[in-house]
C-alpha cells in the first residue's frame, strides 16, 4: 500500500523505522559515485521527502537517467529526523523509474524560479514549490467556501454559463455562436454573472449561491483582471443591504481563519517567501469589526489627500480607482472597509434606488493590496421603479421581461453579492498578480493552451 508524503510529514513518528512505498516526481538530485540524495514530491504536500540512495542497495547503472522531473516509485525504511529541518528521510531499498524525460531537461530546473517565468509554462508551473503552495491553498479555500454556505443553510445553484442577458449592463461580453451564426437565433454570450438567475431561484429556496466560472471581455491589462475567473454569488430573499453586508463579512472572516488554521505549514512557507506578517494581518481582520462608510464620506476623505493620487479629479459621482480604494484601506483605515450608497450612475440597473433619488443600496468591500474584493446590493423589487430605470438606460425590455416578471409574484425583495475567488486568494496568499492564482490564466491578448 502506498503512503503519501503528506501523511508521513504530519505524523513522522508513526512511520519511524517502518517501510514506506512512495510514488512521485524528482524535484532535486545531488550526490557522488557512492551516495545520491533525491528529493521527491508526490503532490500531496508542498514538502519534499528526501530519499537516500546508497550503492550497496541500488545499482547506480540502472538509474543513470535519474533527473529533475522524472517520475519514480521507491520503497525503503523511513527515519524520523526531528533534529533536522526536514521531517525525515527514506533509505531507499528499491527504485523504479515510471516516467522518464524524453531527450531533454525538465523545464523547471530551479525551484526558486520567478512567477513571471512560470507564467510562460502554465502546464508545468504547478510542479514548482511556490505554485504548489498556491494551488493547495486554492483547493482548501474552495472547500471552505462550500462548507460555509452548507452550514448557513444555502442551496448550491448552477447558473447557466450561456445566456442571452448581460447582467452587468457593461457590454463587456464574449459572444457565442456556431459556424452558421444561427444556433440560438438570438445574441448569446458567456455569462458575466449568475446573479439574475440566482434571484429567480432565491424566490423559492430563499438562500442560494453560485460558485462558477465567469467571463468578461475587459481589455484591462492589470494585475487584478482576467477574462475568465471564478465568482461566488449568494442571493438571499428577504435580506436587506445591512444583512447581506453582515453575511459577506462573516463569510470572509470564517473561511480565512479556517484556511489559516488548517494550512499552517503553507502559510509559514509564504511568510518566509514574502509577507512576514501575513497571518497576523489576516487574523487581525478576522477578529475585528469592519468599518462602514458612505460613498460620499469616502470622497470627502480622499479629497483631503487629493495631491497624492494620479487621478485627482474626485467628485460625487466619480468612479473610484484602485489607487483610491487601496488608499482608504492601507493609509486611512489600515484594514478592509465597506463603502455603501453609491451614486446610481456607477452601478447596475437592478439595484434598489434610495429615497434621495441619487444613490442606490449598494456596497463594495475593499481590502488592502487589491481594492474591491466584493460588490453587492439590495435588489430593486418595485416593478415601476425597475422598469423606469431600464428604460432610462435604453435596455431591451423584451429580453429582460422574465426578470421584471419576478417582481409580480410574491417577491419580498432580495440581496446578494459577488466575490471574486481569485482576488480573495490573492488577499489570503499575498500574491500580487491574478495570473498567479489561477491554473490557466486567460487575459487580454493572452490565452496559452
UniProtKB/Swiss-Prot annotation:
Record-linked Pfam families: tRNA-synt_2, tRNA_anti-codon
Record InterPro entries: Aa-tRNA-synt_II, aa-tRNA-synth_II, aa-tRNA-synth_II/BPL/LPL, Asn-tRNA-ligase, Asp/Asn-tRNA-synth_IIb, NA-bd_OB-fold, NA-bd_OB_tRNA
Localization: Cytoplasm
Positions in coiled-coil regions: none
Record carries keyword Phosphoprotein: no
One GO MF term: ATP binding
Record-listed E.C. numbers: 6.1.1.22
Biological-process GO terms, alphabetical: asparaginyl-tRNA aminoacylation
Coarse class of the protein's main subcellular location: cytoplasm
Keywords (A to Z) from UniProt: Aminoacyl-tRNA synthetase, ATP-binding, Cytoplasm, Ligase, Nucleotide-binding, Protein biosynthesis
Disulfide bond sites: none
One GO cellular component term noted in the UniProt record for this chain: cytoplasm
Reactions it catalyzes: tRNA(Asn) + L-asparagine + ATP = L-asparaginyl-tRNA(Asn) + AMP + diphosphate + H(+)
Oligomer and partners: Homodimer.
Entries under NCBIfam families matching the protein: asnS, PRK03932.1
Family to which the UniProt record says this protein belongs: Belongs to the class-II aminoacyl-tRNA synthetase family.
Protein name per the record: Asparagine--tRNA ligase
Amino acid at each position: 500500500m502506498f503512503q503519501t508524503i503528506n501523511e508521513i510529514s504530519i505524523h513522522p513518528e508513526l512511520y519511524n523505522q517502518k517501510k514506506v512505498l512512495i510514488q512521485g516526481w524528482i524535484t532535486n538530485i545531488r550526490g557522488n559515485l557512492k551516495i545520491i540524495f533525491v528529493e521527491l514530491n508526490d503532490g500531496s504536500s508542498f514538502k519534499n521527502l528526501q530519499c537516500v540512495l546508497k550503492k550497496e542497495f541500488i545499482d547506480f547503472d540502472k538509474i543513470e537517467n535519474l533527473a529533475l522531473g522524472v517520475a519514480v516509485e521507491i520503497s525503503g525504511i523511513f527515519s524520523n529526523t526531528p533534529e533536522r529541518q526536514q521531517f525525515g528521510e527514506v533509505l531507499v531499498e528499491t527504485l523504479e523509474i515510471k516516467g522518464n524525460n524524453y531527450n531533454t531537461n525538465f523545464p523547471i530546473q530551479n525551484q526558486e524560479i520567478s512567477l513571471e517565468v512560470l507564467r510562460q509554462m502554465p502546464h508545468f508551473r504547478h510542479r514548482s514549490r511556490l505554485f504548489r503552495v498556491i494551488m493547495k491553498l486554492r483547493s482548501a479555500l474552495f472547500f471552505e467556501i462550500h462548507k460555509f454556505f452548507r452550514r448557513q443553510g444555502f442551496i448550491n445553484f448552477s447558473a447557466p454559463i450561456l445566456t442571452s442577458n448581460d447582467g452587468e449592463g457593461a457590454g463587456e461580453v464574449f459572444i457565442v455562436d456556431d459556424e452558421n451564426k444561427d444556433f440560438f437565433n438570438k445574441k448569446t454570450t458567456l455569462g458575466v454573472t449568475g446573479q439574475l438567475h440566482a434571484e429567480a431561484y432565491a424566490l423559492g429556496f430563499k438562500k442560494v449561491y453560485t460558485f462558477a466560472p465567469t467571463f468578461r471581455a475587459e481589455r484591462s491589462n492589470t494585475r487584478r483582471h482576467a477574462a475568465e475567473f471564478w465568482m461566488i454569488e449568494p442571493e438571499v430573499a428577504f435580506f436587506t443591504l445591512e444583512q447581506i453586508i453582515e453575511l459577506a463579512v462573516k463569510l470572509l472572516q470564517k473561511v480565512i481563519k479556517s484556511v489559516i488554521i488548517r494550512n499552517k505549514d503553507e502559510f509559514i512557507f509564504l511568510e518566509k517567501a514574502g509577507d512576514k506578517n501575513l497571518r497576523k494581518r489576516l487574523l487581525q481582520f478576522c477578529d475585528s469589526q469592519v468599518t462602514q462608510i458612505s460613498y460620499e464620506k469616502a470622497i470627502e476623505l480622499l479629497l483631503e489627500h487629493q495631491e497624492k493620487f494620479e487621478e485627482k479629479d474626485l467628485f460625487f459621482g466619480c468612479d473610484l480607482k484602485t489607487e483610491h480604494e487601496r488608499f482608504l484601506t492601507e493609509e486611512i483605515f489600515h484594514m478592509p472597509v465597506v463603502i455603501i450608497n453609491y451614486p446610481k450612475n456607477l452601478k447596475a440597473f437592478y439595484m434598489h434606488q434610495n429615497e434621495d433619488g441619487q444613490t442606490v443600496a449598494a456596497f463594495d468591500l475593499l481590502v488592502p493590496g487589491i481594492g474591491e474584493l466584493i460588490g453587492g446590493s439590495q435588489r430593486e423589487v418595485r416593478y415601476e421603479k425597475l422598469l423606469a430605470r431600464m428604460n432610462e438606460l435604453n435596455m431591451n425590455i423584451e429580453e429582460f421581461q422574465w426578470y421584471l416578471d419576478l417582481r409580480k409574484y410574491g417577491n419580498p425583495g432580495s440581496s446578494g453579492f459577488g466575490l471574486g475567488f481569485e482576488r480573495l486568494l490573492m488577499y489570503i496568499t499575498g500574491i500580487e498578480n491574478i495570473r498567479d492564482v489561477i491554473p490557466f490564466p486567460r487575459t487580454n491578448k493572452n490565452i496559452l493552451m
